[in-house]
């Protein structure tokens, strides 16, 4: 039969195979066609990495199925896995290994079934389908292994109608898992469910234990509104388009509706609401868009440009961007290239730290401009700010925060505009563009806040 293999460059290779061929055989056929050694090939089907010893039929690969080919980074590395008993296991891995692969390696060494393993890195629970490089796990990183509790617990879910559903769960279940269990019982699709506990809306990727949900806790289930509403989209020409939508529609859905009405491809559309560029994967309700809200439609400029990003190690990365890309988009492109999560990236241009919601054109960043990438230190800290009245304010900050950021945090707490604030540490007035670490301000340091006289010079 014929199957297709799609590479990251978008090229599609056609192979003649049999259901009984092993994945290893398939890799050899790819080598014959493309010259890529099997040990550099990773084949993905239905989101799963295929193992050499298995056959196509094991994975239910049928004629004209499409596999995805990802190249392994050359050369493996060692990582460590620390258990709760304090034992440390050493594993040989590659950056391209999935978390699932790592769990299998742990099973081979320790005999612990993958479904009883939870792996934690940098305080985050790692998802099976992601790779080590997705989480920026590098050589000699240490993961923490927590065993899932065997034997679950009961929790209750109360609906708006007053009905109570009982669920069997484990502390390590994600909110997504819980929604699936509710769907199994009640038939309500997960994307129509919002779960509330202790007044907080629960996020899909988090676990019950993250929210300290214990046995016999009660969650509240709110349905996302079915039943639509009208919103307006205003173009730069002044034309207003009316759309029928639902709160649960994604921004991507909205762009498709605009395409249906106006013929503008989604990838040329930027939607703005309350000064913010809206992200495709988010829903209207995420942005608190209500009936008769007005969005603004800006067209992306066709034809991109190249910019450079220089890291502290001196490495320069080249990115394909558009002037209308947000800083957030740029950070995602850097993550795709370098594996550094956006929340660990700080981008600097012309001495200024760039804000996620702004675009390249907002900062007048043009073709072949160079941005500087500084990594945020993981993990925040507390500092104190003492006012002349003797009041002490506590702030959550990171060493990589600029003085400007700190002043904004003070404004959020105290309502004092940044331009009226002077911050003093160790007898020195602190400059807006510098970071806390530039001044060696460490956890529990105390800054002094002096108010500028109005109309000063």
UniProtKB/Swiss-Prot annotation:
There is a cross-link at residue 76 (Glycyl lysine isopeptide (Gly-Lys) (interchain with K-? in acceptor proteins)). There is a cross-link at residue 48 (Glycyl lysine isopeptide (Lys-Gly) (interchain with G-Cter in ubiquitin)). InterPro entries: Ubiquitin-like_dom, Ubiquitin-like_domsf, Ubiquitin_CS, Ubiquitin_dom, Ubiquitin_ubiquitin-like. Its main location: cytoplasm. It comes from the Eukaryota. SUPFAM superfamilies: Ubiquitin-like. GO terms for cellular component: cytoplasm; nucleus. CDD domains: Ubl_ubiquitin. Residues 1-76, 77-152, 153-228, 229-304, 305-380, 381-456 form the Ubiquitin-like domain. Signal peptide: none annotated. Keywords: Cytoplasm, Isopeptide bond, Nucleus, Repeat, Ubl conjugation. It is found in: Cytoplasm; Nucleus. Residues 457 form a propeptide. Belongs to the ubiquitin family. For the sake of clarity sequence features are annotated only for the first chain, and are not repeated for each of the following chains. Ubiquitin exists either covalently attached to another protein, or free (unanchored). When covalently bound, it is conjugated to target proteins via an isopeptide bond either as a monomer (monoubiquitin), a polymer linked via different Lys residues of the ubiquitin (polyubiquitin chains) or a linear polymer linked via the initiator Met of the ubiquitin (linear polyubiquitin chains). Polyubiquitin chains, when attached to a target protein, have different functions depending on the Lys residue of the ubiquitin that is linked: Lys-48-linked is involved in protein degradation via the proteasome. This is Polyubiquitin. It comes from Aglaothamnion neglectum (Red alga). The lineage of its organism: Eukaryota, Rhodophyta, Florideophyceae, Rhodymeniophycidae, Ceramiales.
